[in-house]
Amino acid sequence: MKEKDNFEMVINFKRAFMGRRNQRTKRAIKMIRNIVQRHFGAEKVIIDPLLAKSITYNGRDKIVRKVRVAVKKIGEKTYLVRLALKSE
């Protein structure tokens, strides 16, 4: 099986909207970590501050519904998650 070093994926935050409104950002960040750990077998997941800022650009309780992320392997079982930008 081919190693996943660079990968783009879309993460849907539908489950982050369940529960209290002021916990949405925390749940969304935790969802990103859990999804990357599950798909790549990562032990350490580093989230880019620009990605966290783009999730909450409307405020802490009004997060975006979906986000496209780029996952890059930077070490042994260590992954960096960044915001994937469209190239035109």
Swiss-Prot record:
A single BP term in Gene Ontology: translation
Acetylation recorded as keyword: no
Molecular functions per Gene Ontology: structural constituent of ribosome
Keywords: Ribonucleoprotein, Ribosomal protein
InterPro entries assigned to the protein according to its UniProt record, in alphabetical order: Ribosomal_eL31, Ribosomal_eL31_dom_sf
SMART domains reported for this sequence: Ribosomal_L31e (SM01380)
Gene Ontology CC: ribonucleoprotein complex; ribosome
One Pfam family linked to the record: Ribosomal_L31e
Superkingdom of origin organism: Archaea
HAMAP family according to UniProt: Ribosomal_eL31
Family: Belongs to the eukaryotic ribosomal protein eL31 family.
Protein name listed in UniProt: Large ribosomal subunit protein eL31
Organism the protein comes from: Sulfurisphaera tokodaii (strain DSM 16993 / JCM 10545 / NBRC 100140 / 7) (Sulfolobus tokodaii)
Top-level taxonomy: Archaea, Thermoproteota, Thermoprotei, Sulfolobales, Sulfolobaceae
